Amino acid sequence: MNNAPHLYFAWQQLVEKSQLMLRLATEEQWDELIASEMAYVNAVQEIAHLTEEVAPSTTMQEQLRPMLLLILDNESKVKQLLQIRMDELAKLVGQSSVQKSVLSAYGDQGGFVLAPQDNLF
């Protein structure tokens, strides 16, 4: 069975999904990125299934190599953008924890509301 055209098409689909994920990450559309992840995983599984059935010829491998390199490059860029986002979220969580600690330590002052005053004397 010659599945070369189907395999090539599957790789093209994976490239498109990879480019979409990179665009979403670049635009910081995190919810959409996460939603698109399953389609990407399914496309990878489809390619794995096709290559298990019949190994691609050397010629086909040479044709697919540029697509693979593009996908790997996109994946690396997406991972970098995700790491930046995770660092931002970790910083926000840290700030939130500090605020919670401060409120817990100083918030209950025997029913008195602590507020700065313009004139102390």
UniProtKB/Swiss-Prot annotation:
Signal peptide: none annotated. One of its GO terms (biological process) is protein folding. Residues 1-50 are annotated as: Required for homodimerization. Residues 60-98 are annotated as: FliD binding. Keywords: Bacterial flagellum biogenesis, Chaperone, Cytoplasm, Repressor, Transcription, Transcription regulation. Coiled coil: none annotated. It is found in: Cytoplasm, Cytosol. Its main location: cytoplasm. One of its GO terms (cellular component) is cytosol. Transmembrane segments: none annotated. Homodimer. Interacts with FliD and FlhC. Dual-function protein that regulates the transcription of class 2 flagellar operons and that also acts as an export chaperone for the filament-capping protein FliD. As a transcriptional regulator, acts as an anti-FlhDC factor; it directly binds FlhC, thus inhibiting the binding of the FlhC/FlhD complex to class 2 promoters, resulting in decreased expression of class 2 flagellar operons. As a chaperone, effects FliD transition to the membrane by preventing its premature polymerization, and by directing it to the export apparatus. Belongs to the FliT family. This is Flagellar protein FliT. It comes from Escherichia coli O6:K15:H31 (strain 536 / UPEC).
